[in-house]
Amino acid sequence: MSKYTLYQGDCITKLATMQDNSVNFTLTDIPYDAVNRTSNGLRELYKGKADVLTFDLLVFLEQVYRVTSNSICIFCGKEQFSTIYDFFANKKGTVRPIIWEKTNPSPMNGQYIYLSGVEMAVWFKKSGAKVFNAHCKNTVFRHPNGRSKLHPTEKNHELLKELILDNTNEGDIVFDPCMGSGSTGVACLNTNRNFIGIELDEKYFNIAQNRIEEVANKTK
């Protein structure tokens, strides 16, 4: 049976207490711009409490690199992508851009401009890491938007499962230092992986805890 540990608080503070190479795979979606619907039905960018970066990105990356033994995948905004990519490009290992191509992109101002139908992530595998179960697979993942929308930037469940299956084996530890509403944790328990999650916002932490506990009780 999968095990899980959840922390409510600042991820940088908790990361500093974790041992080197103590998790196998870090899969996270760091805070960045989300969207809000205006009175005329169009959608505009906004920054809500759950979407604002509250920590130093380079400090965060150094800590994530330190605690992860195998591979890392970080979803991010376009403004953050080059910083994250360049950070890992200067480490020993292999870095790749990951593209989530949404099969049902949101029509945000689509009558005026091209739809924003993709999200980006940076994937990194440490030098000497052994686990990779996606042989000869490319870096484009095609899945629809997440449906439950418990969090403004929630990821598709099947997308998260696919990344977890690609980068871990059963019983491995998956880590999400910005877990939001707990989607990564749910995907871990559904694939027999162990999970460690951190969330700063109390509202989303409680949602994540309830979701993960519900799945854990069903899989006993």
Regions found by a protein language model. Give the residues of each.
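Positively charged, low-complexity nucleic-acid-binding target-recognition regions
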Residues: 1-3, 212-220
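Core catalytic lobe of class I
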Residues: 2-196, 205-206
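Conserved acidic E/D residue at the C-terminus of a beta-strand in Rossmann-like folds
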Residues: 199-200
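Short alpha-helix adjacent to the SAM-binding motif of class I
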Residues: 203-214
